[in-house]
Amino acid sequence: MNSEPVMPIMSDKQKEATSLIVEQLAQSGIKLVASLPDDWIAPLISAVDKDERFKHVPVNREESAIGLCSGAYFGGIPSLALMGASGLMTCIYAITKINYSYHIPLFLFATLRGVIGDPRPHHIANGLYLTKLLDSISLPFFLVEERKSIERIPAAFKHCQAMNRPEVVIFTEAVLLGEA
């Protein structure tokens, strides 16, 4: 049995967008990526997994990614928690309890699900409430709605570290597909 991760089939535009995101992560100094699968970020997860510049740790719960990345901070390892919108929404307690209480920076990537174009009705609540929820707990985020915004990733990571607080980069499907 081959343990190599299978790279999802991607268009050239999607490969280009994924590569750009990966390069921005490397430029940020990220060394560890903890991820929970989401179909929109599967190509990004696969690319990070195959890239020797990163240690990729798949997790089975979003809170595990929060704990792993928070612990990595104390070990001096720049990290990223990578998950879908619903996963991020389930970890709000862990983020406020651990990262807010102890001023631990946490850099997160999430998808913006449940918006126009997302065919899955079970993600509607994500589209309605994700950014409002983040605003309600004063968790800084920026929405990547066009390709040029990908280049802001290193600045967002630096901001997160300077504040000693979490920060989220939220991607639209169009950006992840290389269509925006």
Which residues are covered by each model-predicted region?
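Thiamine diphosphate
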Residues: 2-180
